[in-house]
Amino acid sequence: MLKKKYILYLLCCLLLVGCGRAGGASLSAAQIKKTLTADCSFTAEFTYDTVEGCATVEKAGEVFSITLTEPEVLTGLAFVLGPEGSQMIYGDTVIDLHDHTIHEEALAAILERTFAGTDELTVTRQNGSILATADCTFFHYTVILSEETGYPTAVSVPELSIEILISDYTPAGGTL
């Protein structure tokens, strides 16, 4: 009788252990939105059509600041996107982006939309990462998050040929 109880106990333990997820817990859409809407800073390496570059990005409240650090010819070009309006700044030149549709603005707008957290997300797991996909009217985007930290590591917008690798992601205050 004791042997049967022991085997039953061992079987239950093995079943419970088998139910655990390898590589950390999955994140819900609500948790991902909380991460995306949090104040943060990071480095973004991007490919947009034939343009490759790098930018520093800061999000504070509803204001999103993007400053290009590469390519060299665009170093210092900045975008400030917010609820009161958006601007492109280069040196002493400031352009309000009310009705302008320039190539670089689309990249900035994608980052702003992704980190606004307003789109419904479908969450899946693939190859040790968490994928959060949003379907918008004219395109869809996927945010890839680390299972280990829950922080975003990439954004992909296939219809617009935009790929963004995120590094040095730092939430304001150090942690979420």
PLM regions: where:
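An acidic-aromatic
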Residues: 57-114, 160-163
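Hydrophobic/aromatic beta-strand elements that line small-molecule binding cavities or substrate pockets
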Residues: 53-58, 79, 141-145, 166
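A short, compositionally biased
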Residues: 39-40, 61, 81-84, 126-128, ...
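Gly/Pro-enriched, hydrophobic low-complexity segments
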Residues: 65-70, 122-176
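Sec-dependent bacterial lipoprotein signal peptides
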Residues: 1-18
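Flexible, processing/modification-adjacent segments and terminal tails
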Residues: 30-36, 40-44, 88-139
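Short, compositionally biased terminal leader/tail segments enriched in small/polar residues
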Residues: 2, 6, 23, 158, ...
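N-terminal leader/targeting segments and the immediate start of mature chains
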Residues: 13, 17-60, 73, 98-100, ...
